[in-house]
Amino acid sequence: VACRCESDGPDVRSATFTGTVDLWNCNTGWHKCIATYTAVASCCKKD
C-alpha cells in the first residue's frame, strides 16, 4: 500500500505517494520517511 513521505510534499492531492506502508517497523534496507509515529505501521522508503 502506498503512503505519503514527507519528501513528497504537504499537499495530499498533488503529492506522489512514494512510500510503502510497513507493519511495525521498516524492513532492512528501508527507512521511515514520516516523522509521525504510529504504533501499528510506518511509512517506509527504500534506501
UniProtKB/Swiss-Prot annotation:
SUPFAM superfamilies reported for this sequence: Defensin-like
- What does the entry list under GO cellular component? extracellular region; nematocyst
Judging by the UniProt lineage, the source's domain of life is: Eukaryota
The protein's predominant localisation is secreted
Q: Where in the cell is it found?
A: Secreted; Nematocyst
Homology family: Belongs to the sea anemone sodium channel inhibitory toxin family. Type II subfamily.
All disulfide bonds of the chain are 3-43, 5-33, 26-44
Keywords, ordered alphabetically: Disulfide bond, Ion channel impairing toxin, Nematocyst, Neurotoxin, Secreted, Toxin, Voltage-gated sodium channel impairing toxin
Q: Which InterPro entries match?
A: Anenome_toxin, Myo_ane_neurotoxin_sf
Molecular function (Gene Ontology), one example: sodium channel regulator activity
Q: What is this protein called?
A: Delta-halcutoxin-Hcg1a
Its biological purpose is as follows:
Is potently lethal to crabs, although it showed neither lethal activity in mice nor hemolytic activity. May bind to voltage-gated sodium channels (Nav), thereby delaying their inactivation during signal transduction.
Could you tell me which species this protein originates from?
Isohalcurias carlgreni (Sea anemone)
Q: Example GO biological process term? A: regulation of signal transduction
